[in-house]
Amino acid sequence: RDSPKGYYVQITYNDNAMINVMNLLRDVSNGKSPFTYLPESTRQKAQKAIDKGVECILKTQVKQHGKLTVWCAQHDRETFAPAKARAYELPSLSGAESANIVIYLMQLTNPSAEVIQSIESAVQWFKDSEIKGIKIESFINKDGKKDRRVAPCEDCKPMWARFYELETNRPFFCDRDGIKRYHLSEIGYERRNGYSWLNRSGENVYKEYAQWQKRIRK
């Protein structure tokens, strides 16, 4: 048979696919309900899979000018480098998927020095990558359709972009033509309104990080 092709063969963090599986494996490994009936051998297999998954997470954490940052939504399964998925999902740093990845790492018991470094680096990236003074608002456009746009908001909490450039860390947007753009208004109506381009996922990272620091210091 031909080798499988397409982005779905890559390491996929997009839409929390891998992290959801890792959470499931953790429940199996811990014998959490409804997996209490599973034998010890199955629980051990789940733990081995978790260990491999964590190793993969650490290998795929992107370095930007020699500094650990966060993750792309998908990575090449051979090289671990950031990879393209759909036409509008270019290799990048993800301000969405990376949140749940680092939160997962913070939930590990007895984290290694490498895991701790990974967490600290990712949290610092979230701090450095805050987008302040904006919000996403709905409005009725000139065609009478409900639309979305970026608007100023000095009192709003920080936001994070779905995609940041690998080299510059600049937030960007992209339409189905695969062309990178830097303003939400520059992409078409369908993608502008059909994708989560900006989010506040970093808030959950900060909350979990505060609790994690307390646990680590004990």
Report each predicted region and the residues it spans.
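Terminal, non-catalytic domain-edge segments
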Residues: 27-52, 79-85, 89, 96-218
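Active-site cradle of extracellular carbohydrate-active enzymes
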Residues: 1-20, 24-25, 37-92
